[in-house]
């Protein structure tokens, strides 16, 4: 009897797949559209840390589906590449002087080695790297298309600048904390600073970015996050004249019905009209206030907890309907980057306005009430209701009716109009760094921008000695004079020295996979039409707003220009749950690194002070020393064990804690399959109940893979394997289809068993997914309740009459049971045949 030598088996088949290019895919025109599928992973940033066990979760899910589809006769595109521009490599280069390209490519080789060790079915001939000049040539080409369409422009604007990173950050890359704003990467302090920036007009696509969410199969939570980020609101834009001035102030409001209750206007301190309208005697006070407030973060200025502050400008606006004079203030809680940078303040019907009016003793005029009567207001009434204290034609009407009539009046009298507003801001697209795509623009002495010609692409990064940004905040490229200065037609131009953000390369990489070696086009129309859109995209929920929104924006631009054939890039999106790890917390809630923890009598203690610690579930992190390295797992248990364990831990979309005990159970499961292989292989007919069990398992595994319910598919395989172990022989008519349905989960073992049965490799080229016969499926199952200390923790379907030992084995490996008995002593296990199992612990 041979042993299950997973190391030898896995190396053998990985070498075979590489040598024979088993997973190379071509655009076979004879394969109909319904038999093609594009399955995509969010490609990784190749960090120096390599993979931890959380990374392959999504990759394993797509790999199982890929192999399943191959066995069902599909042409499957399943590529992999690397999002290889980025700050970490540049920061390391600043510290060491080593070129970011060299660092990045070394990291990529480590990533590839780890990914290949897990046996994923990638077509490596389609690998892309965003830092490769043959790739970023086309990123630059897309930028030029955006520029020529009027969607890329230069603007001096207040931006988030991080001195430690030496670059500008987009709003999405800044985290608001109680201690002020910080960079998402590195958690460094950031500040507001006016800088010349390239900006992309994503706002032009705001409505379509919302509307087209209806056409795609994405998690509702992600759709809501995108809708909230875009922040659509419908209302009116109203124009207020200014007393004794030709200037006008535009205000956006979602409640035009409350215009009769406006008692003051508030402008953002940075509003361009402030200096023009401020009375001379107040200019010093206003200037001091502006200087102080502009340095604050948006969150600090708009926080509901913060005290609202403001200063009167001395100027007055005129209410366009009532013609009342209204004082104009500037206030911290109004931001220049949102709406028009001005608000009409109705303290009777808005909480912030109410608070501000109370503080500065400004009038409060009620114009809406629930009953239609005047009421004593102790707090603002912010709901819809009945209009009061308004001109006769607007009085005693419901809110929606008043809104309509006010907008009609404003439009007729040219004082305003109906308006849709978006919270979304244009995308700051430039970075003051070296390690990014150069922007293909040159600039003359008059600051006119001249785009490079397409035959001048790629504009390559020059070699430089120092990767640190200049003291002025400019890119390191600004110091390379022989690169910056360009002579044309006897004139000297300067190159744009900002580079693109890391998001640029990931906005379109899914298209380049279709045609990665094309030197004439970013991808041929034939290949785009053959594969697009991406049928399934799997990645983390942390990309819900940033990458996914930006990629949708670029795709829509390319669609409008006729370069792609679909309005949306990703048909279906799945967010895999996070794989967490155990961490340890002291009595003050402080997390203690794992290497400072010792275990004694099923309890955990600090090595430093011997105090007992609480075991909790936390995100894997270097600081907590709780990262699990897949290399170690593969070495001890094999890639197939790790793959199956990650899928068996729980539903794909759930977060779940890593537990090596569960992995050991999976390793035993694969050894059981090997034990069946070691039995006498016979062509005899199997018993009726075995055949029935096989067809039932095929049905369950097929349905579960289609629905990405991998954990329950594995569970049904386990149940059937346990039944097969009871028999002395290995029936070929059972083992062959069983091997095929096992192969997507454990591809190395699947190939080995396929070859053992005398079949020609690869199983993924030469086998066909078995079909179940409904007539052979006998309903021989029961729902078993799993309890811990009498409380229901889960329910599972098992074969009727399952023996007690098998039931105990399955229950103790169940994810929810394992969570509930972790670090507890099992006193006894009570079973009621075909009904329940109760695990009693203390």
Swiss-Prot record:
Write down the InterPro entries for this protein, in alphabetical order. aa-tRNA-synth_I_CS (IPR001412), aa-tRNA-synth_Ia (IPR002300), Leu-tRNA-ligase (IPR002302), Leu_tRNA-synth_edit (IPR025709), M/V/L/I-tRNA-synth_anticd-bd (IPR013155), Methionyl/Leucyl_tRNA_Synth (IPR015413), Rossmann-like_a/b/a_fold (IPR014729), tRNAsynth_Ia_anticodon-bd (IPR009080)
UniProt keyword NADP, yes or no: no
Q: Which reaction does it catalyse?
A: tRNA(Leu) + L-leucine + ATP = L-leucyl-tRNA(Leu) + AMP + diphosphate
Q: Where is this motif: 'HIGH' region?
A: 44-55
Supply the NCBIfam families for this chain.
leuS_bact (TIGR00396)
**'KMSKS' region, short sequence motif: residues:** 619-623
**Pfam families (alphabetical):** Anticodon_1 (PF08264), tRNA-synt_1 (PF00133), tRNA-synt_1_2 (PF13603), tRNA-synt_1g (PF09334)
A GO biological process held by the record: leucyl-tRNA aminoacylation
Q: Which organism is it from?
A: Borrelia turicatae (strain 91E135)
Q: Which GO terms describe its molecular function?
A: aminoacyl-tRNA deacylase activity; ATP binding; leucine-tRNA ligase activity
Q: What does the organism's lineage look like at the top?
A: Bacteria, Pseudomonadati, Spirochaetota, Spirochaetia, Spirochaetales
Cross-referenced CDD domains:
Anticodon_Ia_Leu_BEm, LeuRS_core
Q: What is this protein called?
A: Leucine--tRNA ligase
Q: Mind telling me which HAMAP family this protein's record contains?
A: Leu_tRNA_synth_B
What Gene Ontology cellular component terms go with this record? cytosol
Q: Where does ATP bind?
A: 622
Keywords assigned: Aminoacyl-tRNA synthetase, ATP-binding, Cytoplasm, Ligase, Nucleotide-binding, Protein biosynthesis
Per its UniProt record, what SUPFAM superfamilies does this chain match? Answer: Anticodon-binding domain of a subclass of class I aminoacyl-tRNA synthetases, Nucleotidylyl transferase, ValRS/IleRS/LeuRS editing domain
Q: Where in the cell is it found?
A: Cytoplasm
Q: Which family does it belong to?
A: Belongs to the class-I aminoacyl-tRNA synthetase family.
Q: In the Enzyme Commission scheme, what number(s) does this protein have?
A: 6.1.1.4
